[in-house]
C-alpha cells in the first residue's frame, strides 16, 4: 500500500513506501467510479492513446481499469485495437460493477490466480493500458510490471489524476481539469518534446548537473552511462524494444518528464525541503547533506527526530539519493494566470524532482523498496555551468 504526503511552498514533497509508476500510488483522490464524465472527449482521448501505442497486427492488448466514469472509453479503445489488426484481450476490472462485455476468456482465466501464475498468463501480452483507477496495489497491474521487468511487453499509464492545489492538497478532478488534460493529450507536440529531452540527455552525458534553490538546495551529480528514461509519449513496440529498465516500458500520458538515477558516488551537496511531513510529523527547514550519494547529516528547525526516524527505518535506502527528474512539457506547466494549480504530478516544464531511496526501476544500484519523491518548483538547473532551468522556468 502506498502512502502519499505532498507539501508545497517552494517545493513539493511526495512520499511513497513502494516503487511503482509515476501515478500508481493509492493516494486519497476522487473516486474514478463516481465522478461525472462531463467534459471528457472520449473519442479524442482514445485516438491519442491508440496513436501513441502504434499497434501492429496480431499484437495482444489488455485494458485494466476501474468501472465507472471511464466506461465510454473502453469500447472506443477496443474497436481501435481490432481496427489495427491487433487482438483484443478484454478489460480486467479492478473493482465491481463492470459491464458484462468487458469479460473475455482471457480475463476469466486470470480470476483467482496467484502472482506467479498471473505473470505467466500475462507474459504474452504485448501491450496493456493501465486506465483510471488501476494501480500497483492491484494484482494484475503488479504482475504486468513483473513482465516488463523481464523485458517483455509495454504499458501506457493513463491515470487521469495528479491535480494539486498550490498548498499541496489534492484538487478535485472537475470539468476544468478534464478539459485541460484532454487538450494536453491532443495538443502536445510530441516530436518537439522528444527532441528537447534528447538534447538534455546529450548535454548531461559526461557533464556535471547542478540543482540549486532559493531555500538553499545545492546538489551536483553525474549520470555516466545510466539510462535516461524519456517520457515523450512514444508507447510503440519499437521504442519499448530499446528500453533499458522497467520504466522505459511504462509510458506516461500525459507525457513530459525525463528520469535518471545518477551515479551514486557522484552525488554531493545539500537538499533543503519546504515544510513537510516526515514520520507523520511536520518538519521545517529540513536539510540533508549528501556525500557520494549517501546522507551524512540531517538538520531541521523542527521535526528532525521524526525525519531521522523515518529515514533510519528504511535502512540504507532511506539515506540514499535516488533520482533526478525534470519536466519538459510546457502544456503541463503551472498556470501563470487564472487559477494556479499543479497539473499531473508537477511534470510541467521546469519542475524538478530529487528523490530518495530505491532506484532499481531506473537502472540504479540502490535497493530496499523505500521511495520518497521530492518535487521542486523553483529550482535552477545547470549542466557544466550552462543554465537549462532558472527559478522553475525552462529556458532552453
Q: Over which residues does each language-model region extend?
A:
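Bacterial N-terminal signal peptides that target proteins for export
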Residues: 1-8
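Active-site bordering "gate/hinge" segments
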Residues: 12, 19-270, 278
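Short, glycine-/Ser/Thr-/acidic-enriched flexible segments
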Residues: 68-69, 134-135, 216, 226, ...
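Short solvent-exposed loop/turn micro-motifs enriched in small/polar/acidic residues
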Residues: 202-204, 264, 279-282, 317, ...
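Short aromatic-centered micro-motifs
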Residues: 211, 289, 381
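Dual-mode signal for accessory low-complexity, basic/Gly-rich regions
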Residues: 268, 281, 297-364
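Active-site and channel-lining beta-strand-loop segments
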Residues: 283-299
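Intrinsically disordered terminal and processing segments
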Residues: 351-396
Amino acid at each position: 500500500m502506498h502512502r502519499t504526503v505532498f507539501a508545497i511552498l517552494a517545493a513539493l514533497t511526495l512520499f511513497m513506501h513502494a516503487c511503482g509508476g509515476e501515478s500508481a500510488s493509492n493516494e486519497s483522490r476522487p473516486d474514478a467510479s463516481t465522478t461525472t464524465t462531463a467534459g471528457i472527449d472520449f473519442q479524442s482521448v482514445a485516438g491519442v492513446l491508440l496513436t501513441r501505442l502504434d499497434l501492429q497486427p496480431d499484437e495482444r492488448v489488455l485494458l485494466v481499469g476501474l468501472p465507472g466514469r471511464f466506461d465510454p472509453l473502453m469500447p472506443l479503445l477496443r474497436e481501435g485495437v481490432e481496427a489495427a489488426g491487433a487482438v483484443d484481450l478484454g478489460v480486467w476490472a479492478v473493482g465491481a460493477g463492470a459491464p458484462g462485455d468487458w469479460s473475455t476468456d482471457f480475463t476469466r482465466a486470470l480470476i483467482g490466480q496467484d502472482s506467479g501464475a498471473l505473470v505467466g498468463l500475462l507474459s504474452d501480452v504485448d501491450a496493456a493500458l493501465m486506465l483510471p483507477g488501476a494501480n500497483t496495489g492491484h494484482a494484475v497491474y503488479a504482475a504486468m510490471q513483473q513482465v516488463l521487468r523481464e523485458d517483455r511487453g509495454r504499458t501506457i499509464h493513463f491515470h487521469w489524476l495528479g491535480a494539486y492545489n498550490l498548498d499541496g492538497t489534492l484538487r478535485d478532478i472537475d470539468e476544468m481539469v478534464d478539459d485541460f488534460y484532454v487538450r494536453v493529450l491532443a495538443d502536445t507536440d510530441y516530436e518537439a518534446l522528444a527532441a528537447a529531452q534528447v538534447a538534455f540527455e546529450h548535454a548531461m552525458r559526461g557533464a556535471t548537473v547542478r540543482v540549486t534553490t532559493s531555500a538553499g538546495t545545492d546538489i551536483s551529480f553525474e549520470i555516466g552511462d545510466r539510462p535516461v528514461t524519456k517520457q515523450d509519449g512514444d508507447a510503440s513496440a519499437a521504442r519499448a524494444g530499446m528500453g533499458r529498465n522497467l520504466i522505459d516500458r511504462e509510458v506516461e500520458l500525459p507525457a513530459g518528464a525525463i528520469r535518471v538515477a545518477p551515479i551514486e558516488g557522484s552525488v554531493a551537496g545539500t537538499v533543503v525541503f519546504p515544510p513537510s511531513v516526515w514520520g507523520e510529523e511536520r518538519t521545517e527547514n529540513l536539510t540533508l547533506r549528501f556525500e557520494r550519494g549517501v546522507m551524512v547529516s540531517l538538520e531541521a528547525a523542527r521535526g528532525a527526530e521524526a525525519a531521522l526516524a523515518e529515514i533510519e527505518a528504511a535502512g540504507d535506502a532511506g539515506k540514499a539519493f535516488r533520482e533526478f527528474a525534470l519536466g519538459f512539457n510546457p502544456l503541463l506547466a503551472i498556470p501563470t494566470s487564472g487559477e494556479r494549480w499543479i497539473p499531473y504530478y508537477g511534470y510541467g516544464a521546469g519542475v524538478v524532482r530529487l528523490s530518495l531511496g530505491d532506484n532499481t526501476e531506473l537502472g540504479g544500484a540502490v535497493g530496499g523498496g523505500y521511495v520518497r519523491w521530492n518535487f521542486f518548483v523553483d529550482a535552477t538547473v545547470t549542466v557544466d555551468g550552462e543554465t537549462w532551468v532558472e527559478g522553475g522556468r525552462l529556458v532552453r
